Amino acid sequence: MGRRSSDTEEESRSKRKKKHRRRSSSSSSSDSRTYSRKKGGRKSRSKSRSWSRDLQPRSHSYDRRRRHRSSSSSSYGSRRKRSRSRSRGRGKSYRVQRSRSKSRTRRSRSRPRLRSHSRSSERSSHRRTRSRSRDRERRKGRDKEKREKEKDKGKDKELHNIKRGESGNIKAGLEHLPPAEQAKARLQLVLEAAAKADEALKAKERNEEEAKRRKEEDQATLVEQVKRVKEIEAIESDSFVQQTFRSSKEVKKSVEPSEVKQATSTSGPASAVADPPSTEKEIDPTSIPTAIKYQDDNSLAHPNLFIEKADAEEKWFKRLIALRQERLMGSPVA
């Protein structure tokens, strides 16, 4: 049983080897032909040797060698098949990764060379871009100036044409009229033009006056600001002493009677006798009202309703006379 199993194994191995040889011979047929032409003598010798070996009876050692070779070749074929199946199992992802790594290595190798060679070209291109940008800016500025000049010229032409058209229209409108009416119409036009010119001058004067007022107000505000800053500095200083408050109205009142006294001293003694010196009336703090007082007598009607008829008529006549005087003289009613 052991011999039969070994024979079957040997037969299967020999079959596999023959198949492998056929495949290898079909793939390398072209190479073998060229090689056979060059070295025909050697092939003939090897063939004769192989024929002699086949004719001779095979020994036991030869069979052993063949078995060993077939086993080694079969193990090599199985290894190759396994490696192929593994590579197929890896699939496209492995190939893509390998191609990417190769491309990266190529780029990394090629970059320093490009940098070393392209420094001068980068400088020249940078200079060119600078000069081009400057030229573009200059062209844009020139184009803007030309457009502005063309606009100004167009406006001047339009105004000139309008004036010419107005004068032509006036002449065409006055041709059919008699000379007296033409003179009147021209006078009216001249007066209208003068009125327009006066209005324009007045508007200019108003604008100038407003500008002056604004300047004066700004100056006044500046002076007030400076004064305020100085007062704040004086208050914040160490030498500041607190004083009682005095309103500006009281200061003005005290200044006015002093001026009156000076005028009386300059005038004669007769005026001094005629006009006695004015004395200020001191105001009592108790007389200053601190609250509003209402006159409520708990009455339902106004007291004027309880006046007699004659008194009411007299008051009404007096009111009418006052209103009439206001209308005639323009004086307000007291």
From Swiss-Prot:
Basic residues composition-biased segments: 14-24, 35-50, 78-118
Coiled coil: 180-236
Origin: domain of life: Eukaryota
Places the protein is found: Nucleus; Nucleus speckle; Cytoplasm
Expression sites by tissue: Widely expressed. Expressed in brain, spinal cord, cerebellum.
UniProt key word Transport: no
InterPro entries assigned to the protein according to its UniProt record, in alphabetical order: SRRP53 (IPR034604)
One of the protein's GO biological processes: response to antibiotic
Compositionally skewed regions (Basic and acidic residues) per UniProt: 1-13, 51-62, 132-166, 201-218, 247-259
Gene Ontology CC, one term: cytoplasm
Keyword rRNA-binding (UniProt): no
Post-translational modification: Phosphorylated.
Keywords, alphabetical: Coiled coil, Cytoplasm, Disease variant, Intellectual disability, mRNA processing, mRNA splicing, Nucleus, Phosphoprotein
Positions of the UniProt region annotated as Disordered: 1-179, 201-220, 243-290
Function summary: Has a role in alternative splicing and transcription regulation. Involved in both constitutive and alternative pre-mRNA splicing. May have a role in the recognition of the 3' splice site during the second step of splicing.
Classification via PANTHER family: SERINE/ARGININE-RELATED PROTEIN 53, SERINE_ARGININE-RELATED PROTEIN 53
Self-association state and partner proteins as the record states: Interacts (via Arg/Ser-rich domain) with LUC7L3, RBM39 and RSF1.
Illness the protein is tied to: Intellectual developmental disorder, autosomal recessive 70: A form of intellectual disability, a disorder characterized by significantly below average general intellectual functioning associated with impairments in adaptive behavior and manifested during the developmental period. MRT70 patients manifest impaired intellectual development, mild facial dysmorphism, febrile seizures, and behavioral abnormalities.
Name of this protein: Serine/Arginine-related protein 53
Annotated source species: Homo sapiens
